[in-house]
Amino acid sequence: MLTFMELAGPTEGDGGGSVDSQLWAACAGSMSSVPPVGAAVYYFPQGHAEQASAAVDLSSARVPPLVPCRVVAVRFMADAESDEVFAKIRLVPLRPGDAVVDVGEAAAAEARREEENSRPRPTSFAKTLTQSDANNGGGFSVPRFCAETIFPELDYSSEPPVQSVCAKDVHGVEWTFRHIYRGTPRRHLLTTGWSPFVNKKQLTAGDSIVFMRDEGGNIHVGLRRAKRGFCSIGGDDESLSSIPGWDQYRGLMRRNATATATGGRTPPKGKVPPENVLTAATRATTGQPFEVLYYPRASTPEFCVRAAAVRTAMAVQWCPGMRFKMAFETEDSSRISWFMGTVAGVQASDPVRWPQSPWRLLQVTWDEPELLQNVKRVCPWLVELVSSMPNLHLPSFSPPRKKPRNPPYAELPLEGQIFTGPVFPPNPMAHDHHHHHGFPFLPFPDSSAQPAGIQGARHAQFASPFPEFHIGNLQPNLMLYAGIRLPPADRAAPAPRPPRIIISTDLTIGSPGKPDDAACSPSSGGKKIDDTKPRGFLLFGQAILTEEQIKNGNSDGRPASPNWDAEKAPNTSEGSDSGVTQGSPTKNTTPSWSLPYFGGNNISRASEYELNPGQCKVFVESETVGRSLDLSALSSFEELYACLSDMFSIGSDELRSHLVYRSPAGEVKHAGDEPFCAFVKSARKLRILTDAGSDNLGD
């Protein structure tokens, strides 16, 4: 096992000796953490490159998205010129078969940390310098808390109360300040000795100064440099000065901000030489020990993350709509605030270079976007899940839906369930590097095993969160449950593998076979359909031509038309917001269908709905997904109103004036206009209107 002695000799960029760990932690901030020796971590080269001072080209090294490593040494240091603290971490990649878990040293470190947490922590205080504090020749206004808890106690009996305060910086240099209590109203000030300190450290307004008192009563002083030109978008922060609390939260975006102008890649803004990043990534790829420099005050999260935290975060099947909260600290680390957000997307931040990387996997939106306007992407292990259910935007009088029942077939979605994908199941990744482990938590399938021609079409991975949902793969009874009628297998002519059903509103897909009951068009005089003609696609009422159809154009220069006329095909009945789309065949047509519950030119007849007599669908006016209701089990309108009241939590009196249906003749009626027995026979689609004066059934 490597020890600190192997790192004793300072190397280029070290900036001198080690820094007291407590002072280092006070300067780094309460949210910064460094894994202890012996801890199992995942090293993210993508995150390491974000701390580089220039762009890093890692394409030649074939660097994986993450490398399992063990921490063998940690050294806390500070820059010789700026006093900015950083850590040098030595890592050893784990070999195949090694468990990615902490070893005894890390467990002992955790025990020591718990013991230290039980003891009183050293008192520290940070203040962001104002223009007056940073003025050359001026003084420093000491907050009362700092003066009374960190500085030695003043003798208030003297006039004025005054004393000398000695503090050591991160390099061990001692500074002496004159502490006086004066003014109207009276306040604590550092006068003599402050100006030389400002000049030596080159302090400016926006920088923060940290005072800490250790257990022995010694006072230490450290610095936090402001991140200039960072919080604003294409300008200064003056445009945001009117936002309440902006000065306090000016640094909230420091550790997690991303730029969108570079296609999701965070532009380099760190202090690590790019050659150091390339060397570390290359050695990690080849399984050799390597060192990294970590700046806790940089604009990016930690890139050496505890393995347990990554596994826990990636065990969640993230999808858009999930609610989460995330902790941020103010620039002076005076407090930590939690901000609520919503997952807007789940996609690799750099799908070309690292298509499988979970680094900054989540695209997010915030409830308070003014304060977090640059935080567009976050890592899953930095957020805390609040709700795994996406937000449902329902009418004001309509409550959330009741808990759905499990369908009889696992291959199909729940009735009324909306596909919010992409939802990524665990996918193991096999990598050719000898040290690379299988990562069951990686969010995307491994593209290295795909043919070269498929790798260029990775976007097809996101077409549907159910990749096995093929017409040809489902049994006829499963398709009947979905509302799609297929011909018997013994009557269907052999056909190539049908295209995948893409879940999209108003998307109609050509038939893969030739069912006898639809092989002859009514308007074509019984002529058989030409099998050789390519299938056509109808999207939002417009014909979508394939490349083959464009090449095989008509003699007059027009492309060959699809197998049906989109503009002339009428609906077979009055529309419905839920059901199977059965395009009316015209000349040279093939039967077509679309998935239920996703709109389209729908029909309301019981046979087309695949509903038994006495059954119907119930909709709320603003919804496109209906719920099944068995009217034959009811005996009166009162029971109907009571059932719907329990189903939607709407008062029975309100339902009497808001419930309408369409008769077989196409007439819109209110419930109660005809006897209940006649209503049961004719009603196939009920709709609860948000406006009692509306007769809109959504057709």
UniProtKB/Swiss-Prot annotation:
SUPFAM superfamilies noted in UniProt: DNA-binding pseudobarrel domain
Tissues in which the protein is found: Expressed in roots, culms, leaves and young panicles.
Compositional bias (Basic and acidic residues): 110-119
Gene3D superfamilies given in the database record: 2.30.30.1040, DNA-binding pseudobarrel domain (2.40.330.10), Phosphatidylinositol 3-kinase Catalytic Subunit, Chain A, domain 1 (3.10.20.90)
Ranges where the PB1 domain occurs: 613-693
DNA-binding region residue numbers: 125-227
Superkingdom, taxonomy of origin: Eukaryota
Localization in the cell: Nucleus
Claim: Nucleus is one of the keywords in the record: yes
Pfam families membership: ARF_AD, B3
Residue ranges of coiled coil: none
Predominant localisation class: nucleus
GO molecular function, a single term: DNA binding
Protein family: Belongs to the ARF family.
Domain notes: Interactions between auxin response factors (ARFs) and Aux/IAA proteins occur through their C-terminal dimerization domains III and IV.
PANTHER family, alphabetized: AUXIN RESPONSE FACTOR 10, AUXIN RESPONSE FACTOR 4-RELATED
Name of the protein in its database record: Auxin response factor 10
Name of the gene: ARF10
